[in-house]
Amino acid sequence: MTDYKEIATPSRTKEILKKHGFSFKKSLGQNFLTEPNILRKIVETAGINQQTNVVEVGPGIGALTEQLAMNAAQVVAFEIDDRLIPVLADTLSRYDNVTVVHQDVLKADLVETTNQVFQEKYPIKVVANLPYYITTPIMMHFLESSLDVAEMVVMMQKEVADRIAAKPGTKAYGSLSIAVQYFMEASVAFIVPKTVFVPQPNVDSAIIKLTRRATPAVTVTNEKEFFKLTKASFQLRRKTLWNNLTHFYGKDEQTVAWLKESLAEAEIDPSRRGETLSLEEFARLSNALEKNKPV
């Protein structure tokens, strides 16, 4: 059909919202993108083709879903808002390679759902415009699940994207940077201005590209304790590593001796700040803490 207008065009978005009497829920962080060229750029950045299976979160009225469906083998989209299920059934009716799952993605068994939907064992990529209020939990849900995700190309608040891709010694670097970079290689692909959304958010967005590492960035003896340590090291932002560690682990004699011994073994100066430590240094310290842990 030559007169077909893509979902993301401003006029078609308006038409769809009016037809279904849809009103935005602020609590769900709903902002719909109305610029097809940006959506095509997202699909291009993710390298989506007929040998790619895609998981999307929060499809909204299906603007990005449509672009994914045009290029991917199959798409499974998780939508929590029951008001959008009939909208998506309408807007995506021409695409038979899309499955909309009416569920909170954080409660979903990602492996089971994708196994049921995807007919071919193609690489899985996560491509989504993530709701601002729940960006980090959704990302960590995918990273910590046993779903084999080759790549994530997701839109989020620019500030969060900067934190994820941040390098040691920068203001944005923190436990989130480490948690993501442990599993993935991270880079900000491009910026999306706030003016291309309905309703318009208060801040600009960014597309971040995360590529799964063959093995984690560093070798740690206890992954859970490693992440606990990195979180602890940034609790008191402008304090030294020593202040943070004693604040988190305790100041009793045995704990202090354990921390001192481990820091010395890892060759890390306790007067440094957490944001100056690289992933390798955190791994060294985590392994020393694990090795010297009081019985």
UniProtKB/Swiss-Prot annotation:
Pfam families: RrnaAD (PF00398). Gene3D superfamilies: Ribosomal RNA adenine dimethylase-like, domain 2, Vaccinia Virus protein VP39. S-adenosyl-L-methionine binds at residues 31, 33, 58, 79, 104, 129. Keywords: Cytoplasm, Methyltransferase, RNA-binding, rRNA processing, S-adenosyl-L-methionine, Transferase. InterPro entries: KsgA/Erm, rRNA_Ade_diMease-like_C, rRNA_Ade_Mease_Trfase_CS, rRNA_Ade_methylase_Trfase_N, rRNA_adenine_dimethylase, SAM-dependent_MTases_sf. Transmembrane segments: none annotated. It is found in: Cytoplasm. Its EC number is 2.1.1.182. GO terms for molecular function: 16S rRNA (adenine(1518)-N(6)/adenine(1519)-N(6))-dimethyltransferase activity; RNA binding. Belongs to the class I-like SAM-binding methyltransferase superfamily. rRNA adenine N(6)-methyltransferase family. RsmA subfamily. Specifically dimethylates two adjacent adenosines (A1518 and A1519) in the loop of a conserved hairpin near the 3'-end of 16S rRNA in the 30S particle. May play a critical role in biogenesis of 30S subunits. This is Ribosomal RNA small subunit methyltransferase A. The lineage of its organism: Bacteria, Bacillati, Bacillota, Bacilli, Lactobacillales.
